[in-house]
Amino acid sequence: MTPAERRAFERQLQQEFPGLELHAWYRQYRSLKAAHPDAILLYRLGDFYETFDDDAKLVADLLEVTLTYKEFASQKGRDQKQRCPMAGIPYHAVEGYVARLVGAGYRVAIAEQMTETPSSRTDTRPRSIFAAGIEQTALIGGHKMVERKVVRIITPGTIIESGMLPAERNNYLAALIADHGRIGLAYADLSTGEFAAIEFSGERAAQQAQGELARLNPAEILVPDRADLRLPGLEPSSARLEQDLEFLTREERERVLPGERIARRVERENHARWAHGHVTAWSEQRWDLRNARDTLLHQFGVHSLAGFGLADRPLAIRAAGAIVQYARETQQGTVANLRAIRVYTPGDAMVLDPQTQRNLELLEGNSGTTRGSLIGVLDQTRTPMGARLLRRWISQPLCDLARLRARHDAVDHFVNDAILRASVRETLRRVGDMERVVNRIIQGSGVATPRDMARLRDALRALPDLVAALEDWTPPQEDVDLSGMSALQESAALAAAPLDGITPPDDDHTEQEPTTISLRAQREARRRVSARLTGDDLFDEEEEQENAGQPAPLPTTETVRASGESARPSFEMPSLHGHGESPTLDACADILAFLETAIDDDPPALLGASNYLRAGDNGELPRRVIRPGFEPEIDRVVAASRDAQRWISELEPKERERTGIKSLRVDYNRVFGYYIEVPKTYADQVPKHYIRKQTLTTGERYFTDELKRYEEIVEQAQQRLIDLERRAFARICETLAGAGVRLLRTARTIATIDVFAALAEAAVRGRYVRPELYDDTRLRIIGGRHPVVEQTLDETFIPNDIEMDTETRQICLITGPNMSGKSTVLRQVALIALMAQIGSFVPADAAEIGVVDRIFTRIGAQDDIATGRSTFMVEMTETAALLAQSTHRSLIILDEVGRGTSTYDGMAIAQAVIEYIHNEPRLGCRTLFATHYHELTDLERTLPRLKNYHMAATEQDGRVVFLHELRPGGADRSYGIHVAELAGIPQPVIRRATELLAELERRAPRSTPQPAPERTEERPAAGRPTARSHSAARGDPPRAPDGQLSLFDLTPGPVIEMLRRLDINQLTPLEALNKLYELQKLARIGGG
């Protein structure tokens, strides 16, 4: 705090607690809390992270932990204690508890101890997962208060701990900003280093941004905190967000809004599912263009953003700058793994709006899990990073023919070699999540853990087998391009030796001898790299201590203390530049050799948890981070303390023999250290030089000056070893981070190989075929099947053929009974096209597909209660969107358009939609239209590119049998009553419905679309610029006065005709009576 802020803080405490003396720890807690009022503050106290006041009540309720009370102040001049609520969680379980708090929508700030008391034995405990690399410093002088500092702020979009993240999904942080009709969107996954940005413009910008957010499904979204927060076209979710923000103060708007008002409402918004993510409203000043540009230049270590494609995208720059600033703020430092950004455009991939993603059940089934979804079928991956990549491919299919054919070639390679496929998939099981592990290591020892090193080592151990299996095969490289990492590459080029181990993307991996350079030269190289990246000289240039191989010093406290204070790493940091590895997959043999030398076989989970000196106590096995022989200084300190430990271990038998006390015992605990315990019955035999330490009911505990001296040697050695271990670990992280680009390229190549092998496995299991892709608008599927439905059926799935193009078969109008499979056919066609464009084989006997730029679906609907929209309104909104955004290369799937209103209204709208798609010059796209309006089949006579199909059914013994076959021609019946009977409708209702249906069919003439007046305008053929004249049909079906087909709207008879002709105003009472008699007579003889 600044002096002014400190004075204001003190005044606030005096006003809040008049007449109270606050304890020092509580003042410290309130000071930290004041700096982070929007977060739950976890305050480290010994083995627990404690929360106080309102935070404690909230944590106790959410996490179901005990709420207690702790003294925090005393009354001046009185012996009256003041207590506050307190709830704590153990440090070793903090990760799981924090995940629950963040999942509930709260920010969590971690306040860690930064200093230790010299006399405290408990401060050598390991750090938590969130502060693994934080180095404590000893308190000096008379200060008794341990310093604490917030080291991390954890929010839904900034989690980097693997244990808190789903392995198979990315955890995106997104930033969204709109200005003058343009929208900038950036997103990053801090756990993998993925960073990308896009800018939308034009009248479709809002819809495109909404679709991209739906694809990403970010965990957290940053938006500017301002009055015009609403983004046009992103209704209704952003509208509701704006309404909620109006209830908050400006300070509250800057918080991560925790689910109470916003998430509860927006989760009901089915058509904008991204909105259920947590929203953080940031003040508008943080989105300043100049500030954002400077932030990115510094982050990437470059002088211009033109090389990333950002020069002419100001809103993308502002969004990306907000991502980096927010990440730095929450990580409380730099974000080393965001070293490049990928800029892309809306036309790079197939467009899938939120409705299509939901209707086709791409990533989630109806259950909210992957069961019943496309990814549930295709995901045969063996690594978490492969699973994440497959999800990205499914949500962002390609439109580039060359890249698609390369992907199909790769899948074909694995399909045709079962032995290779099995070998690669078995080897991939051993790789794990190398991508996230490498990203944690790149971020340094403050994030990486010893277990991360062990996981990376285990992954690299599998690479030689993978390289050998793949031999000379080269997978497509488009998904592993890291050429944008120019900052790291430029920095590596500055080094005197190839310390950073970065191979530029275009370099040939030529053979070269490993280079070993002196530690001094390596320090100088690192210093210049560090200065270039951060502007700071992080490494000193002191001389290396040339004391390797010297005999261990005598076990004195001075020896141990001196070794710790002057320690410099004496191990040689190797060059991690590539050494002639495979051009396809770098086995990273030199990196593996380095890790094998540096990291012990089974390191503890966290730094500070090693037991270099007390291994064997209570049956504990030796565990250490640094392998013996790697860091001589650690080995010297261990050796220097061995004699002290040996002396202590030999003390018990010596003292028993010298004193004659056979039950004398020498032992240790963390509170009192080493002691000599003597039972009370031998009190008179205790030597005079024994000094009493503790009295027990059964005896006394003592120590001697000599035992105390050796105890200090052991304790100081333990602390020095922890310090040396932390320093050595930081250097190891630093060396590996220098090879970060190389390791990331390897990890992402492995992920790509994993996806190809998985798609091949799915193809073999599902009997899929390779699709043929073309740069036109054909769509020919022979023996097509639904990839998900066929796996859930007990019986054989009935395949179907379909053939479309925009010249002769643009629209397929499908009629047929309920439950006959119309919706399945619609979805399977869309899924087959999508699967082909992610690089997968498809469930068919053969498939020829012209590249689809967008898939639109209008399948099913329900009332949108949250926004007050009826089923029909939802249906019409979605239909309007697809009609406005489709192109001649799109694929439209329409199921039961018009069913949400009256019969004639619905049929009129359905016919008008068909005509618009058929006749509109901008459209003319491939369309599958399923309907129960059988009258629409007559449009085949007047719309030349519309063809009728129906789902076949037959009757056997009075029951309908669905054949699930798509056949040419229109259906003549819907069999709705049969379906009602199958659903369990009572028999009296079924019988009455049958009677009414027969009556309606007998009396009501069939409504048939009538030919429309011939149009005179010229219209190009579908998807072509050439104009031609045509006649379009637009029939106007007969309409009841209320627009609704009625059960009683029958054919008029003589009685009705007579009534219509009567002029009641001109009739006398006698004439009226006579007319009534005539009408009654006509009715009795059946004149209707």
From Swiss-Prot:
Write out the ranges of the annotated region (Disordered): 498-579, 1000-1048
Query: What organism is this sequence from?
Result: Roseiflexus castenholzii (strain DSM 13941 / HLO8)
Quote one Gene Ontology molecular function term: damaged DNA binding
Q: Which UniProt keywords are listed?
A: ATP-binding, DNA damage, DNA repair, DNA-binding, Nucleotide-binding
Q: Where along the chain is ATP bound?
A: G816, P817, N818, M819, S820, G821, K822, S823
| Protein's name according to its UniProt entry | DNA mismatch repair protein MutS
Which GO biological process categories is it annotated with?
A: mismatch repair
Q: Which Pfam families did the record assign? A: MutS_I, MutS_II, MutS_III, MutS_IV, MutS_V
Classification via InterPro entries: DNA_mismatch_repair_MutS (IPR005748), DNA_mismatch_repair_MutS-lik_N (IPR007695), DNA_mismatch_repair_MutS/MSH (IPR017261), DNA_mismatch_repair_MutS_C (IPR000432), DNA_mismatch_repair_MutS_clamp (IPR007861), DNA_mismatch_repair_MutS_core (IPR007696), DNA_mismatch_repair_MutS_N (IPR016151), DNA_mismatch_repair_MutS_sf (IPR036187)
Q: Name one GO cellular component term.
A: cytosol
Q: Which family does it belong to?
A: Belongs to the DNA mismatch repair MutS family.
Q: What does this protein do?
A: This protein is involved in the repair of mismatches in DNA. It is possible that it carries out the mismatch recognition step. This protein has a weak ATPase activity.
* PANTHER family per UniProt: DNA MISMATCH REPAIR PROTEIN MSH1, MITOCHONDRIAL (PTHR11361:SF34), DNA MISMATCH REPAIR PROTEIN MUTS FAMILY MEMBER (PTHR11361)
Disulfide bridge map = none
Q: Where is the composition biased (Acidic residues)?
A: 537-546
